[in-house]
Amino acid sequence: MKVRPSVKPICEYCKVIRRNGRVMVICPANPKHKQRQG
């Protein structure tokens, strides 16, 4: 899980979602692409 000021989808499978008011990227294809805005 990377925590960065701006989150962007890295590949075609990345999804941008909101959880508890936080913007996150989840990726079923490549778990390294997981990000959270912080």
Swiss-Prot record:
The keyword Translocase does not apply. Pfam families: Ribosomal_L36 (PF00444). Keywords: Ribonucleoprotein, Ribosomal protein. GO terms for biological process: translation. NCBIfam families: rpmJ_bact. HAMAP family: Ribosomal_bL36 (MF_00251). This is Large ribosomal subunit protein bL36.
